[in-house]
Structures are given as C-alpha cells and as structure tokens.
Regions:
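Perimembrane helix-loop-helix junctions
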Residues: 52-76
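Membrane-lumen/periplasm interface segments of specific transmembrane helices
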Residues: 71-106
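Hydrophobic/aromatic-rich transmembrane helices and adjacent perimembrane loops
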Residues: 175-193
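Membrane-interface transmembrane helices that cradle and orient dolichyl/undecaprenyl
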Residues: 15-30
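Short, small-residue-biased leader/transition segments that mark boundaries at the very start
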Residues: 1-7
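Juxtamembrane membrane-water interface segments that cap and precede transmembrane helices
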Residues: 99-122, 135-139
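Membrane-interface helix-loop-helix junctions at transmembrane boundaries of multi-pass membrane enzymes
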Residues: 136-160
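Membrane-interface alpha helices of multi-pass inner-membrane proteins
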Residues: 30-47
C-alpha cells in the first residue's frame, strides 16, 4: 500500500542526510554506517535501492569520508537489515522472505522498452528531464558562487538524478517506484535555481515551468479518470 511505497522513500532521504553529514569528517564510520543501514533497510522493500550503494561509495570518496574503516562501517550497515531478515526467516522457516529481495534485484525487465510506460509517466519524465537539464546547467555554470560544501552537495544531487534517469531507461518497469526518488533530487536542484536567480529569463522560465506543471497535473488527472 501507500505506507509500503513511502518507506523506501523515507529510508532514501535519511540515507542522503547521513551521507551529507559525513562530508570531510575524519571519523565518518558512524555516518556511513547509518547511511548504508537505511539503504539496506529500504532495499528489502525495494531491492533496486541496492544499486545506489555503489554510487554512495563513489560519492563518499568525493566527500573525502571514505576510508577502510568507514567502508567497513558502510558494509556492516548495509548487511545489518539482511541479518535481521535472515534471523526472522530462519526462525519462522520462511527463507523465501530472505531470498526475495535478491531474486527481485536479479530480475531485469525489458531493457530500454519505454513503450510499457504510461502516457502520464512519459509526460512527467519529459517535464522532469527539462527541469533537470536547466538546473544542472545552472549549477555547473554558476557553481563558483556557492560554497565548496554546497557545490559538492549539488554535484551529488546531479549525479543521483542522472543515475535515476539511467535506471528508469534500463528498467522502465520500475518507473513508478523510481519517479518519487527522481522528484526529490530534481526538486532540490530546481529550487536552488529559482532561489538564486532573479532575472527576466529565470522569471519567464519559472512562469512557463509553473504553467506546464499545472497542465501536467491536469493531464495526469484526466488520464487517471479516463482509465477508470
């Protein structure tokens, strides 16, 4: 249900929070432990979150928080929810519960088969892609105006958003699960653009983006009603 869908999103947000906290920390093991603990917990319900653990390690390296000790902390954090799941599954003789996330992770749908996406999903993806290109370009061009830490965080969000777009193209069947995560990272980038720019071009783009958002909302509602 809605709660099951919301849990991976919450774990995703908490994981990002602790990853950000690890920025240039000499003792980052605890932060990376919690960051990967949430990724691991979320991946039990949505196994594709596991893919982000690879990106997280790369970003931790860029944040200068990845050492052998913090890597071990991350590894322990990610495996802990699975040890708990294994204990539950073994005790109640329901080992299929433990195997399920790994089977889901290994099961790929039709790669690049975007035809399976609903019209509202394609429209939403197109809208988010345009916003991403504009906001990412602004971050790259005007990045010198931000603090070094802020630039690192924004680059992380660009990487995550790009990673999500690639995942959706590779696994279109997971689009409905990946879209909320895409909206989170994209909304922060576009918010950064609108807050820090105040000229005629950005104002026009803001108005156009808002009008398109209203039209997109109307289209999504119309599509939903039509399908019923």
């Amino acid at each position: 249900g809605v709660q099951t869908c919301a849990l991976p999103i919450l774990t995703f947000l908490f994981s990002i929070y602790f990853l950000f906290k690890s920025y240039q920390q000499a003792q980052a093991s605890g932060y990376l432990f919690y960051s990967f603990l949430f990724i691991g917990a979320g991946s039990i319900l949505f196994p594709q979150l596991t893919f982000f653990s690879v990106l997280w390690l790369f970003e931790a390296h860029r944040f200068q928080s990845l050492t052998f000790r913090s890597f071990c902390g991350a590894l322990i954090g990610w495996t802990m929810p699975y040890w708990m799941l294994f204990g539950h599954a073994f005790f109640y003789d329901q080992m299929e519960l433990f195997y399920h996330p790994f089977k889901e992770l290994a099961t790929f749908g039709d790669i690049f088969n975007l035809q399976i996406l609903q019209p509202w999903e394609l429209a939403t993806l197109g809208y988010l892609l345009v916003l991403f290109i504009v906001s990412a370009a602004h971050c790259v061009v005007a990045g010198f105006e931000d603090k070094i830490r802020t630039r690192a965080y924004l680059q992380f969000l660009i990487d995550v958003t790009l990673f999500l777009f690639v995942l959706i193209v590779l696994q279109p069947s997971q689009c409905s699960n990946l879209l909320p995560l895409l909206m989170i990272s994209n909304s922060i980038l576009i918010g950064h653009l609108f807050v820090l720019t105040n000229n005629k071009t950005s104002n026009i783009f803001f108005i156009v983006a808002t009008v398109c958002l209203i039209l997109l909302f109307g289209f999504n509602v119309w599509t939903l009603l039509r399908s019923e």
